[in-house]
């Protein structure tokens, strides 16, 4: 999705991109645990993302200003790590394991079922912002594969049919 489209979409869902004083205080508390500001960036981005759901261009600009580092430095970290989201994501994050073991045990059928029922491709978010579908290389549950995680809930031995029931429980 183009950045301009994402920005326009975010305006429609009325997201405010301004850090509160309390959030700024917490950011400086995070920095205290690190030797440099740059080394604290991942934790800062995770903290900000927890509040806003994703890291917008406006938040990067504001962080650069208060941390006195370049936007490029922040963008570099934000785009490198797959768990830092640079566009709006769904209320429910679905991660399907695509490791070798899950692949052998049918993760492709799971992926196809999820894509069909959500009407999205991998890496996309549903139009109603209920779900985002992401691959993950291993959920550490290989003996019970295929496995998916929805938010913090792990589901084992899933089938292309059982994922449909799971989706309904998160509506």
Curated annotation (Swiss-Prot):
It catalyses: a quinone + NADH + 5 H(+)(in) = a quinol + NAD(+) + 4 H(+)(out). The keyword Isomerase does not apply. [2Fe-2S] cluster binds at residues 97, 102, 138, 142. Its EC number is 7.1.1.-. It is an enzyme of class 7 (translocase). PANTHER family: NADH DEHYDROGENASE [UBIQUINONE] FLAVOPROTEIN 2, MITOCHONDRIAL, NADH DEHYDROGENASE UBIQUINONE FLAVOPROTEIN 2, MITOCHONDRIAL. NDH-1 shuttles electrons from NADH, via FMN and iron-sulfur (Fe-S) centers, to quinones in the respiratory chain. Couples the redox reaction to proton translocation (for every two electrons transferred, four hydrogen ions are translocated across the cytoplasmic membrane), and thus conserves the redox energy in a proton gradient. This is NADH-quinone oxidoreductase subunit E. It comes from Buchnera aphidicola subsp. Baizongia pistaciae (strain Bp). The lineage of its organism: Bacteria, Pseudomonadati, Pseudomonadota, Gammaproteobacteria, Enterobacterales. The gene is nuoE.
